């Protein structure tokens, strides 16, 4: 099945309406009828605002979390609209993907 992999990037401690942003994203996706999604924590990374590493105590809560969904492109667009309508400004990637099951 040809779908897209929608990856949304958030800071691990960021919140939206009192809920961790990655939890809010998973809940919003479930409300749209998306049947599955995952949030992955990172060990280290860097971006335009510098390097982040789990070993730096003072950076606690600033490591990225990737929230990932494999859905049809139209569903990904619906979720991105929900995110925008909620006033969240988040970085995302939408990549072509193929889902299958091994025998």
What are these model-derived regions, one by one?
Residues 1-103:
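Positively charged, small/polar-rich N-terminal and surface patches that mediate targeting and assembly
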């Amino acid at each position: 099945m040809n779908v897209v992999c929608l990856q949304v990037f958030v800071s691990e401690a960021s919140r939206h309406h009192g809920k961790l942003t990655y939890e809010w994203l998973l809940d919003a996706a479930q409300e749209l009828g998306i049947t599955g999604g995952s949030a992955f924590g990172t060990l280290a990374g860097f971006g335009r605002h510098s390097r982040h590493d789990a070993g730096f105590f003072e950076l606690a809560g600033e490591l990225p979390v990737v929230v990932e969904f494999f859905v049809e492109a139209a569903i990904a667009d619906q979720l991105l609209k929900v995110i925008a309508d909620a006033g969240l400004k988040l970085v995302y990637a939408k990549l072509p993907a193929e889902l299958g099951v091994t025998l």
